[in-house]
A protein has these predicted regions:
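Conserved short alpha-helical segments that host acidic/polar catalytic motifs at enzyme active sites
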Residues: 1-160
Length: 160
């Protein structure tokens, strides 16, 4: 399982991001990550293993290094996230909480299209990177996200 939290604000968002992501800590115990974006500075990212400690313990001392008005936080039981991508669409950060059921098929299609995978987890394709590669196949972000929905076969699940 896992959970993510995102925020875009007119003011600094780091505290909201930290507490919003921490709120999802019960959703997973393997890894956590945060990324913020500040105009003129770019992305600031940190990823930690949570198997021996809590989210707050790992990230609280780093909060001063994060700047910006937008950010993503993730609690993941699968891949280290967030990942940063630089593509023809521009630079972006991405997180996922998903169960992609057709990774081998998508992996073959992307490799046949001269794409590559650089984020491997336990010798398996990182599903977040796979989804990012599907996004960047689009002419813009909207087209790329629609491409993800067209190609991925996944288990849809909602929780409250």
């Amino acid at each position: 399982m896992g959970g993510f939290f995102g925020t875009v604000s007119k003011t600094a968002c780091v505290a909201d991001l930290f507490y919003g992501t921490d709120y999802n800590s019960h959703m997973g115990t393997k890894r956590a990550g945060m990324v913020t974006y500040a105009e003129g500075m770019g992305f600031m990212r940190s990823i930690h293993n949570l198997e021996s400690s809590y989210f707050r313990t790992k990230f609280e001392s780093e909060l001063s290094k994060f700047k910006g008005n937008s950010g993503l936080g993730i609690i993941s039981d699968t891949d280290p996230q967030p990942i940063l991508i630089n593509s023809h669409l521009g630079k972006f950060a991405i997180v996922t909480v998903a169960k992609v059921n057709n990774i081998p098929e998508l992996e073959q299609d992307l490799l046949a299209s001269n794409m590559h995978f650089s984020e491997m987890s336990l010798s398996k394709t990182n599903q977040t990177e796979l989804i990012a590669l599907l996004v960047i196949q689009g002419k813009d972000f909207v087209d790329g996200i629609e491409n993800v929905f067209r190609k991925i076969k996944a288990l849809a699940r909602c929780s409250s």
